[in-house]
Amino acid sequence: MSINEVRYLPECGSTNAYMKEHFEEFGPVGAVYTTNQTAGRGRLGRTWVNAEGKALYYTVAIREPLAQPATLPLLASLAVRRQLALRYGVDCQIKWPNDLLLNGKKIVGILCESVCYGYQQQGRGILCGIGINLAQPQSYFDAADLPHGTSLALQGAAIDLEQDPGWLAEALTDFGFDQPLYTFARDGFAPFREKYKAACVNIGRRVTFDLPDGGQGAGEAVDVDEEGRLVVRTDSGEEHVFTGEVSVRGIYGSL
């Protein structure tokens, strides 16, 4: 499974929205990126505030069948983590399911969503949008009311805004997704599970999580299973969490 085309956009509303509109122009797997995204949105409907030229916004679109499409965000977090380590020497942690943290602050957000295409919209695909904070100053996070956000530059990385966005987009395409997708499409999340668990900041910490009935549960996160669910040990037994908000003690100010 190869990425057939990577398209650079000087500006767009949202790379995910662009991919939805142009999905059929790409092959089985395609990608698009920009450093100027004016109308993005985050997980659970949150707005992703634009910082022109100082962040990378990248979306990969897949129409090939995947063994476990719901776990693509977890694979994506590993892909980005590896490329940031190679480029900048940083050791990011993953806050389940797919936020990347550096020194306890969010540096990468990932948003995956399904898309329909083709005759009578019978085709099914998946989009994976990634936002990487490269060089926003602290004033950006203050003005955007993002107290738990940071950028690579704020954490001491040397950022070249002329070269780095293109390099990262190319690296994500060639090594982050292109190679792992062969395995992921066939075998799902299981081959990547141990690497994910080793980087997951939730494991061993107390977490609170949303319940299907609208309530909240709490316990210690002890595992991530082969379906990508966070396993939480509660007073009443184990819960396998796959959707909703999860707060982690000591992260983002959670107690």
Label each residue range with its predicted role.
Residues 1-90, 106-108, 115-116, 254-255:
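N-terminal lobe of the biotin/lipoate ligase/transferase fold
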Residues 65-67, 74-92, 102-255:
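Long, positively charged amphipathic alpha-helical accessory segments at protein N-termini or as interdomain linkers
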